[in-house]
Amino acid sequence: MKTIGLLGGMSWESTIPYYRLINEGIKARLGGLHSASLLLHSVDFHEIEACQSNGDWERAGEILAQAALGLQQAGAEGIVLCTNTMHKVAQAIETRCDVPFLHIADATGRAIIAKGQRRVALLGTRYTMEQDFYRGRLQQQFAIDTLIPEAEDRTRINQIIFDELCLGVFNAHSRDYYLQVIDALAEQGGEGVIFGCTEIGLLVPEESSPLPVFDTTAIHAADAVEFMLS
């Protein structure tokens, strides 16, 4: 089994499922008392969010690249960045580290193609929904088109993520709102929906969604398990 390095804390609420899912995946594959060989560097999200708000992505990339290098030096044979949004600075990490970087959009793209879909809705932070680092990669690497909510909805979705989900607040009103947005995107031709923020799956159960769900946390964790056992 390879040792995986998890770069988490953004938020820590969604890093917990990564740890659980990877361990469950290893146990399911190997049985007995087997568990995941992994390292975790959990950053202070306050510092990262300040970089996001100020548009200082270079500084954010430097912080995460240094943390990833520390994981590599500690024995990690691959790096998993446990957040969608911060894949905006994935190149900084890939440049600094010599070990494989398991990109969340690549894992998600493969999962979408495996289901025979090419046009999917995308929910996430405003950075993930509006900027090209995620949607562009899905289009360029997999020819997947993404539908995003209207501007007003994007603002509210982002606000719920940072003011509620990242703080461990999960309420029914916000859940219902997300489901309404998914409904609207289904009417626009969405074949599935990407939960493109690792906290969304904590709020919206897959079985309640009007569209098939691509939960990036679960997909990314499964990709990590495959890498570890390859």
Protein language model annotation of sequence segments:
Residues 1-230:
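Non-catalytic structural scaffold of enzyme domains
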